[in-house]
Amino acid sequence: MSKSENLYSAARELIPGGVNSPVRAFTGVGGTPLFIEKADGAYLYDVDGKAYIDYVGSWGPMVLGHNHPAIRNAVIEAAERGLSFGAPTEMEVKMAQLVTELVPTMDMVRMVNSGTEATMSAIRLARGFTGRDKIIKFEGCYHGHADCLLVKAGSGALTLGQPNSPGVPADFAKHTLTCTYNDLASVRAAFEQYPQEIACIIVEPVAGNMNCVPPLPEFLPGLRALCDEFGALLIIDEVMTGFRVALAGAQDYYGVEPDLTCLGKIIGGGMPVGAFGGRRDVMDALAPTGPVYQAGTLSGNPIAMAAGFACLNEVAQPGVHETLDELTTRLAEGLREAAEEAGIPLVVNHVGGMFGIFFTDAESVTCYQDVMACDVERFKRFFHMMLDEGVYLAPSAFEADFMSVAHSMEDINNTIDAARRVFAKL
């Protein structure tokens, strides 16, 4: 047995499923998950000594690559001053100033510890501000594991929510309406059925939890218009896309202004950080200035703030997003060409520094139904064959992949060459 196999066997006796987040267990592709020893730049190194070109990037935060010296040094310096104080620090103010500078739609920001905390808090705030209970989310979009968000669509195109996990009360889930991503008609139907009851729409501007599905040109502006028409707030969940698709996020890339924005992943530079913010009048409803309660023992943790501040300053440097886009575009084009040479039907979606691979005969993938029609079994084989080639992709056909500026063009070309060898055998 490999060292990873031995560790996984031991972990399953102590940790549910052997992992602390389900996708890490390789249930989407089968086999034994890799246990990682270290990471540097664009590479992961497992406990058995094998190196991999990494396109998971800790599920998005590592936009600068692993073990970036500026972030590492910031963490070390902050740790020498203390780990946590439970009181305000100057770094929290500096971090808030930087975030609100980089994302102009955020007049104010509240720091939390995860993307889930950000989305659940933003929804609570939207409900408190509007005095309404219902929310709209989209099939195939993921916004963390808060009860109100673990809801799937029911039997009809428009239906009251049904729980997607045991432990979520149906009476609570009924306030969540699930619409079809990239389908404005389904959203209008929800508003027309409940015109005075919907507090907010929450949406991934690029759906990254059904692989990578960009919005159609009219979708996000259409959501903005519907929210304005019916008096609801628009929450854009930029946990994945923030500072990655563009410096000011996908909202800037696509030209839409939300009322509230949720951030995570890159904002922490690899440390557990989330944030939500937006219009001043909405944020003023948050405790302690307003009645909507939200709190956190470790929110604004000085080490996490130092890591995030260092990361965002690096990400804001000229050329970062141009490099991300150039590398991702080259990889996407190369994968398409290699698949075409082998006669394998493939769609590769990409926006900025994120991309998704779909085995499908369809010309495009634009919604959850398109994703579910793709060949998952072929993806599983592709994943493991690429892993054998030393390329680590997201271990699920329903998760996006991520580029970093630490990847070199040689890494990209080596990945394309590996895919060409795999496609020939697939």
Swiss-Prot record:
GO terms for biological process: protoporphyrinogen IX biosynthetic process. Keywords: Cytoplasm, Isomerase, Porphyrin biosynthesis, Pyridoxal phosphate. It is found in: Cytoplasm. CDD domains: OAT_like (cd00610). It is an enzyme of class 5 (isomerase). It catalyses: (S)-4-amino-5-oxopentanoate = 5-aminolevulinate. Pathway: Porphyrin-containing compound metabolism; protoporphyrin-IX biosynthesis; 5-aminolevulinate from L-glutamyl-tRNA(Glu): step 2/2. The keyword Membrane does not apply. One of its GO terms (cellular component) is cytoplasm. The keyword Isomerase applies. Its cofactor is pyridoxal 5'-phosphate. The modification N6-(pyridoxal phosphate)lysine is found at residue 265. Its main location: cytoplasm. GO terms for molecular function: glutamate-1-semialdehyde 2,1-aminomutase activity; pyridoxal phosphate binding; transaminase activity. PROSITE patterns: AA_TRANSFER_CLASS_3. Signal peptide: none annotated. Its EC number is 5.4.3.8. Homodimer. Belongs to the class-III pyridoxal-phosphate-dependent aminotransferase family. HemL subfamily. This is Glutamate-1-semialdehyde 2,1-aminomutase. The lineage of its organism: Bacteria, Pseudomonadati, Pseudomonadota, Gammaproteobacteria, Enterobacterales.
